[in-house]
Amino acid sequence: MNRPCNIAARLPELARERPDQIAIRCPGRRGAGNGMAAYDVTLDYRQLDARSDAMAAGLAGYGIGRGVRTVVMVRPSPEFFLLMFALFKLGAVPVLVDPGIDRRALKQCLDEAQPEAFIGIPLAHVARLVLRWAPSAARLVTVGRRLGWGGTTLAALERAGAKGGPMLAATDGEDMAAILFTSGSTGVPKGVVYRHRHFVGQIQLLGSAFGMEAGGVDLPTFPPFALFDPALGLTSVIPDMDPTRPAQADPVRLHDAIQRFGVTQLFGSPALMRVLAKHGRPLPTVTRVTSAGAPVPPDVVATIRSLLPADAQFWTPYGATECLPVAVVEGRELERTRAATEAGAGTCVGSVVAPNEVRIIAIDDAPLADWSQARVLAVGEVGEITVAGPTATDSYFNRPQATAAAKIRETLADGSTRVVHRMGDVGYFDAQGRLWFCGRKTQRVETARGPLYTEQVEPVFNTVAGVARTALVGVGAAGAQVPVLCVELLRGQSDSPALQEALRAHAAARTPEAGLQHFLVHPAFPVDIRHNAKIGREKLAVWASAELEKRA
């Protein structure tokens, strides 16, 4: 019998092969004395498989089965991982939304998803009632103590399904597996439709791209990524931190977990990498670091590499919720390309992960229904990055206009068709076949002299003394926009005539073609809620416009 196409299909096999290996280790209670987490809550592979089977049976008996769209609002905990694997085993469709997004946007996301079930902690159910989230959800499950809102509890369902036996739906690769909402860093979040083949493809590509092998110990600081660990046979140590605020993580607590459990690999956003870099403590057990969500600043790459063993690897995969991974680059290559990045070449995101096919097309803000409408650009030409491959998703849920704007239908030579995803990013290929990222398409600045791309301007100015980071925005109508550089300073620094002169001199020497004349110091850039690393340039553009009016 063929194994179903399902991310949970590997779990029963791992439960037989390595039943006593810890699959999930959670912080649990605070340890006595030093205030560190005890990490006394664990699940081994045998327990993860058996308990998720019981939950799946209980959920099925309650009416949450194959194809049922189910909102999941549960903090990183054993219950979160058990629940997610139970839903995958059932062939139900978990709906995941970042809890930190704007409340109105969150309500819109849940309304669009039209969920039939809602599973959450008590606080999530209170918010559901007060803010009228997901009124379509008829089946309610509480993770924890249920109060007066009806439904049942996850614990009760697990008890009810205790004798249900193995549970694994015969899911097909084309079946919907989940709806994962984007972070909404450049607009209202969109629900990305994941099919089972997309998750299975991600597992295969992540394993091959990074050489992940069963038995390793991972510290995933972005909870959804922890779901990949059990499918790869890894032990997942859930860090003692708020996953929605990686920039505020306590490096002492992270190091405590890394040292105590011999963590061999960790995943974190660039904001979390900066936390570890500033802390400056070596990471002797870590052989693989992966950072994604936004380009990692060159100084952070260099510092993290200096804290790792000499043979360790620091990977920065390029991709998006809609398609991941697309390309990967290792820290050594990033250090070699640092000078080019700081000279305005963009950020190297490395080699395309096979079997993805990445092509650069001419920038066009209009939808492209068919690939014949796209014009593929030559090596060195900046255009929109597109990708076709096993993890390229094909639609957004209940967002036909967004789907039309981001997806292109392509007919292949054998008559078959596939969907090409438009990344919404601009970039180019160099002569060595490496992909370079130049910024978001919607964040390009269209001046009278021509377009400017954020990642070809900002790194040039991030090297100026006293500057923490910069953000290029445009003020005015497209085609005649005035470029403005917003500047965030290092702690203890302040705006001054000397700083303004240094920025102007840098612009004249390094980017004369950009025509930059306005440098506005901003107290703290707005960033995305998922990785705390993507700069909210749309908000900064509004602020910059108002500032220029004041100074006119």
UniProtKB/Swiss-Prot annotation:
EC number: 6.1.3.1
GO molecular function: acid-thiol ligase activity; ATP binding
Leading EC class: ligase
Binding site for ATP: 182-190, 316-321, 425, 440
Alphabetical keyword list: ATP-binding, Ligase, Nucleotide-binding
Record's catalysed reaction(s): a (2R,3S)-2-alkyl-3-hydroxyalkanoate + ATP = a cis-3-alkyl-4-alkyloxetan-2-one + AMP + diphosphate
Domain of life: Bacteria
Function field: Involved in olefin biosynthesis. Catalyzes the conversion of beta-hydroxy acid substrates to beta-lactones in the presence of ATP. Can use all four stereoisomers of 2-hexyl-3-hydroxydecanoic acid.
Similarity section: Belongs to the ATP-dependent AMP-binding enzyme family.
Subunit structure comment from the entry: Monomer.
Protein name stated in the entry: Olefin beta-lactone synthetase
Source organism (scientific name): Stenotrophomonas maltophilia (strain K279a)
